[in-house]
């Protein structure tokens, strides 16, 4: 099936249960405390301590790095896609949508980057994928700048108006983009 549930931190328990998620990627501030939903397997929970910033060198903040992208991609490649994968950050707007794009490309590498970005925008008007995660992912996945260009094409999402989780398919629909 290959569905990715993208959520803000306050909604993870509710959405994990509602969608039957058993695995989760958490992109949260370093040392941020939160409880893993009981339905999520401890062995299939990736926690990355990374701030939502687009460049390094901002004091004590941790910028997304190649090691974070490598961990996301390795985790994605271990996802059996039998149940939806829950991906979250604090607000569900920047880090987690960027990770969802990278996960989709890790499990379905032959898909079109532009069509993928359009699917993301159709799923969420608020999503504004973290530029640094996208840029590093583009390079590591050898996309040749196509993912970066596709995300630039969809532009910044709508202003944040509250928690707006969404479900995003890792693969294009048959006969669609």
Language model segments and positions:
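Glycine-rich, flexible N-terminal cofactor/catalytic loop recognition
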Residues: 1-40
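Glycine-rich His-Gly loop
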Residues: 28-29, 50, 91
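A short, gly/pro- and small-residue-rich
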Residues: 34-52
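Helix-loop module immediately N-terminal to the HCX5R catalytic loop
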Residues: 46-85
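Amphipathic alpha-helical interface surfaces
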Residues: 68-72, 85, 95, 99-100, ...
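Catalytic cysteine-centered active loop of the rhodanese-like fold, especially the PTP/DSP P-loop
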Residues: 77-107
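PTP/DSP superfamily signal
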Residues: 79-84, 105-177
């Amino acid at each position: 099936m290959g569905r990715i549930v993208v959520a803000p931190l306050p909604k993870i328990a509710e959405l994990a249960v509602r969608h039957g998620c058993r695995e989760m990627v958490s992109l949260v501030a370093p040392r941020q405390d939160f409880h893993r939903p009981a339905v999520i397997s401890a062995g299939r929970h990736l926690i990355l301590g990374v701030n939502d910033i687009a460049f390094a060198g901002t004091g004590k903040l941790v910028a997304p790095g190649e090691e974070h992208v490598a961990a996301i991609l390795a985790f994605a490649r271990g996802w059996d896609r039998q149940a939806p994968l829950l991906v979250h950050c604090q607000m569900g707007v920047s880090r987690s949508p960027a990770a969802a794009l990278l996960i989709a490309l890790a499990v379905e590498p032959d898909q079109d980057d532009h069509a993928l970005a359009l699917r993301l925008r159709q799923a969420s008007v608020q999503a504004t994928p973290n530029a640094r995660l996208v840029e590093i992912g583009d390079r590591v996945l050898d996309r040749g700048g196509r993912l970066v260009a596709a995300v630039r094409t969809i532009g910044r999402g709508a202003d944040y108006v509250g928690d707006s989780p969404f479900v995003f398919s890792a693969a294009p629909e048959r006969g669609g983009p």
